[in-house]
């Protein structure tokens, strides 16, 4: 993309100056994209542990546009100017479907509509003002809406994987950005080493083995991000309470099942906070959140998802509910005072559209004559090999009054779970 095509630049604390074109500026200035300024990147709760964690999905989306463009421009497989342009705008729009409080809102959205934030992104790109502006700027709306969520049907599957894969620009940006704003220093990764050593094998993105140490650092950093920030016990306590508030208020207000584009765009962190404070069914929870009167973790342990009981815990809500009831019965308190939380920490990044085995990342090495030989990461990295299972955390939350008694009951009820390490409080 030639310099004279750029309209100007935006200064970003992570990537420095991000140049944007006039077409990109017109899309950035839409209500749909500007709404992301009012949706925190980490959702609610992280700022209660890391006070600097107030960054939003807007700057993250700009960072993805920047990295997506660099990756597309530097792939050895030559892309034309239109394809690079499409990748930049699709990465910019990949998060527009998020509801208020980001992933905390998603379970309620999915329960009420059967949709994910990716589905909502496609809907907004196709039906909101974005469609008219994209067409005016000579983009194909259908292609952009699918590419933005990694679902476009193309022989060039690696275009999807720039946005949605095991090592995509979304993850590259949020690891750097979340680390910077929280101050948790897990995110010191040389992402450009990854970008400049990527290639395409059988239509899939792959990383040159010369960058193996950087790829290993990337994977370990992602584990660190989940453990230190995303699934921090206090962050999860806040989010569990917020999920309760959302469910309670939705029974009266019905905001999660909106069929209106404009009504959905009205939902952001600010407007939803006001709704939850004013709704009688959620008001008391919001008062507790405002005073940082949070649920307390009374029991915590870790286990691995290959165990059959562990898998059922993760996938079967009725089993988790039954265990909550058993813990409450032993403690002689109401079931609603016990919450079993089982977040899953991804070891090797797994969320991708590759045709390879789950949790594996294509890598390759070059022979002397320049031939690229594909390998599996698990075959060449001793660091990655033991991380081929998901480490999961099981926590039991209750209020301060019942904390010690619930801890005792939880140990008895969960004694059959293959917990490898228990944390004492």
Feature-to-residue mapping (PLM):
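Histidine-centered, transition-metal-coordinating active-site segments
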Residues: 1-86, 96-425
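Elongated alpha-helical scaffolds
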Residues: 91-92
